[in-house]
Amino acid sequence: MKLHTLVMFTLVIGSPLLPQHRCYRNSQTFQLVHTLNKFVGRRRRALKPTLHANPPSEHLQNLKYVREVTNASIQICNDALKECKGDVEKAIELVRRSAKNSSFVSTSVKVKTEGLVGSQVGGDQVVMLEVLTDSDFVARNEKFVRFVRTLLGAALAGGAAHGGAVTGEGSGATALLSLPYDEQSGGSHSGGPHIAHSTTTVGEQMNYLRNIFREDVRIGRFARYERKNANQFLHCYIHNRVEENIGTSGVLLVLTIDELSEKLKSQGECIAEVANDMALHILSAKPVSVSVSDLPEQVVKREVAIIRESLRGVKKPEGILDSMVNGKMRKFYSSVVLLEQEYMLDDTKRKVSQVIRDFCKKHNLNISVRHFDTFIVGEKNILREGPMGG
């Protein structure tokens, strides 16, 4: 092989190393071969970590998380994580104490997971649950959808038997595993073998699906609300529906309406429409609480402390600083409190509270929002679900 051909081959693929023991015509040729050998050796060492890359470390995942919440530079987020020894919550606070990064860019962050959300009203209660898996292929499988459908029925039956209300991913979701699993109670289903019968539990059926799909199948978040009085209107909304009551995101909503039973007879469609519109807004705007008074006290105190720290270098009288803090807190409330948010389903720039008042005046109703929960597969709200909400 001619020398120039061997040189080009070496530069393109990084192999083989040129032999140095052979005789070349002059010292310049030998020097070229020696330089190429050094270059190829360095290239091989540089490529080796790329070819055998390890999964993203916990530090990189935390770095992505902090940056997504604060939108600060990677260097600032990295320094904050190092200073806080990997504590994500403290790192977010530290970054936001800077005047440039004091505002939340987003209270929702992406989570790498797939699955479905199901929600249904039954009698005096409404339930919403999330079933998670590793791939979209499994999440759209009929057996997986059937499991979510049947689990909804089991959750409603279990809630009717035991009562109470629960929201979260802890004991409430765990309690579902021991419920009886009966596909007949969960609605119709298409054919195919299954092990469901009267003695099967939800946990056993879930293990059965894991063995079939060779993927993790687990119950994520779970919420149940039981009607407290006859004036509470229970509503659920499912977005990107796979079938009725099942989709990729959902909202559980409770409204209080004076003289509900009488109003439903004459204005049932109007009430259902406003409940659906309110659920759509909640899904889009992702509020944390209904009103300012419903916000957790520790969240408010933390926010005030972060804002004051960000204003520490401002040379202003105390009264003006207090006004600046109040102004920033109003902006914070307008992003995380439902009644303070700008209504997203029209361009009138009205607050949600004003939209409700206008609707009540128009239809001679008295409506207030009592409670809501929002589940979006692949997203979590850091003020409700951590780390900031912890």
Swiss-Prot record:
Q: Under what name is this protein listed?
A: Elongation factor Ts, mitochondrial
Per the record, its GO cellular-component terms are: mitochondrion
* Classification via InterPro entries: EF-Ts_dimer_sf, Transl_elong_EFTs/EF1B, Transl_elong_EFTs/EF1B_dimer, UBA-like_sf
Output the Pfam families linked to this UniProt entry: EF_TS (PF00889)
Role according to the record? Associates with the EF-Tu.GDP complex and induces the exchange of GDP to GTP. It remains bound to the aminoacyl-tRNA.EF-Tu.GTP complex up to the GTP hydrolysis stage on the ribosome.
Where, per UniProt, does this protein localize?
Mitochondrion
In its UniProt record, which GO terms are filed under biological process?
A: mitochondrial translational elongation
What's in the misc comment field? This protein may be expected to contain an N-terminal transit peptide but none has been predicted.
Q: Name one GO molecular function term.
A: translation elongation factor activity
Family of the protein in this entry: Belongs to the EF-Ts family.
Q: What is its main location?
A: mitochondrion
The alphabetical list of record keywords is: Elongation factor, Mitochondrion, Protein biosynthesis
Keyword Mitochondrion: yes or no?
Answer: yes
Q: Which PANTHER family match?
A: ELONGATION FACTOR TS (PTHR11741), ELONGATION FACTOR TS, MITOCHONDRIAL (PTHR11741:SF0)
